[in-house]
Amino acid sequence: MIQTESRLEVADNTGAKSVLCIKVLGGSKRRYASVGDVIKVSIKEAAPRGRVKKGEIYSAVVVRTAKGIRRADGSLVKFDGNAAVLLNAKLEPIGTRIFGPVTRELRTEKFMKIVSLAPEVL
């Protein structure tokens, strides 16, 4: 469960290490984002020679949450931390590699590229 001012790790090779959620997209009163939701983020920590710079604003999709996601069979998939993958204006991933597992809930038309790049799908 991600809200405004939440800090997330970055799970791709764009050069960003940590980001801050500045807006949850999808309606004016929308408060929380879960796995598969798109948010606006500001880069807070970045590698010196990365593709992105500190202070830049990007869209991102949430790929892991510590709160977890409930499946239809009753199981709950949780992670140790919150993570996101940075997206361009067309909602395509900027990075060419994904680090760590992602959930099956990302298997929609929009984010199949992220699922195919991920080393493990839970």
From Swiss-Prot:
Identification of the protein by name: Large ribosomal subunit protein uL14
Organism of derivation: Variovorax paradoxus (strain S110)
Gene of this entry: rplN
Family under the similarity heading: Belongs to the universal ribosomal protein uL14 family.
Molecular function GO terms recorded: large ribosomal subunit rRNA binding; structural constituent of ribosome
Record's subunit section: Part of the 50S ribosomal subunit. Forms a cluster with proteins L3 and L19. In the 70S ribosome, L14 and L19 interact and together make contacts with the 16S rRNA in bridges B5 and B8.
Keyword check for RNA-binding: yes
HAMAP family per UniProt: Ribosomal_uL14
Gene Ontology CC, one term: cytosolic large ribosomal subunit
Record keywords, A-Z: Ribonucleoprotein, Ribosomal protein, RNA-binding, rRNA-binding
